[in-house]
Amino acid sequence: MKIRVGINGFGRMGRLALRAAWGWPELEFVHINEIKGGAVAAAHLLKFDSVHGRWTPEVEAEGERVLIDSTPLSFSEYGKPEDVPWEDFGVDLVLECSGKFRTPATLDPYFKRGVQKVIVAAPVKEEALNIVMGVNDYLYEPEKHHLLTAASCTTNCLAPVVKVIHEGLGIKHGIITTIHDNTNTQTLVDAPHKDLRRARATSLSLIPTTTGSATAIALIYPELKGKLNGIAVRVPLLNASLTDCVFEVNRPTTVEEINALLKAASEQAPLQGILGYEERPLVSIDYKDDPRSSIIDALSTMVVDETQVKILAWYDNEWGYVNRMVELARKVALSLK
């Protein structure tokens, strides 16, 4: 038995989530809601992607539908979740990928429209189950949790590293810097923006800005609340990104021990296929289309004065993230059968 899935917001995350999920037997995609461009633009951008290339299935628009290998998905252009007749399409699960609705109050209309579960492709600002696959997905209780967030791409990169180091050595405190690719929250040329640095042209500068990824770790490890913080630096690339982690740990360690812990974790459950480990001298482009959330650059691991640790972790901030979101959707789907 499949569950019926709808997508709200067919931008970067919505389109790539559909690509990553297409063909999984638990998920039947039936509806797309996107306010810009109509079905023609949706079909075209699903098929052709400047970063991730041409998608293998045949994709076309036919009236108010998108056809994928002749399978029809209905299409609408409503501005608010409450305006979409999700119940008419029999939608059980919505992937909320618009980036606009991030509080329980703005997400509650889905449930009033008959949707059983909602997974948000962004952090939710208030109470919602914050899931990082491989780290705390065991917390999901089908009868209790209906609104879930798949956290952020950077949190999905950082959390596996924190899990291994905190459980293996103990983390006193730390500072995180994510070297992050451009996103649509920035501007191509200078334009007004509430963040004056993001107001500047993306292709001409390295742009320091905020990230909540480090503080979000406290939702998973409450004992680290107030002990981790971080910053993002947006760079003029489209893919992939890098997280620079600096921790003070509880006991003396070595580069060899750090790398051994991370390598071992990457080879067994629950982080196998989520955490990677790489000893070759690779660069960011080599991680484009990598479905893992976090890949350790073992050559860059450092230890200073026995307890200060530096770890670099690569991630495809789009493809890695949507693969975890789809894994969460499959977990939810199995709970609804």
Swiss-Prot record:
The record marks 180 as: Activates thiol group during catalysis. D-glyceraldehyde 3-phosphate binds at residues 152-154, 183, 198, 211-212, 234. CDD domains: GAPDH_I_C, GAPDH_I_N. The keyword NAD applies. It is found in: Cytoplasm. Pfam families: Gp_dh_C (PF02800), Gp_dh_N (PF00044). NAD(+) binds at residues 12-13, 80, 184, 317. It comes from the Bacteria. Pathway: Carbohydrate degradation; glycolysis; pyruvate from D-glyceraldehyde 3-phosphate: step 1/5; Carbohydrate biosynthesis; gluconeogenesis. The active site is at 153 (nucleophile). One of its GO terms (cellular component) is cytoplasm. It is an enzyme of class 1 (oxidoreductase). Gene3D superfamilies: Dihydrodipicolinate Reductase, domain 2 (3.30.360.10), NAD(P)-binding Rossmann-like Domain (3.40.50.720). The keyword Nucleotide-binding applies. GO terms for biological process: gluconeogenesis; glycolytic process. Its EC number is 1.2.1.12. Homotetramer. This is Glyceraldehyde-3-phosphate dehydrogenase 3. The lineage of its organism: Bacteria, Bacillati, Cyanobacteriota, Cyanophyceae, Nostocales. PANTHER family: GLYCERALDEHYDE-3-PHOSPHATE DEHYDROGENASE (PTHR42955:SF1).
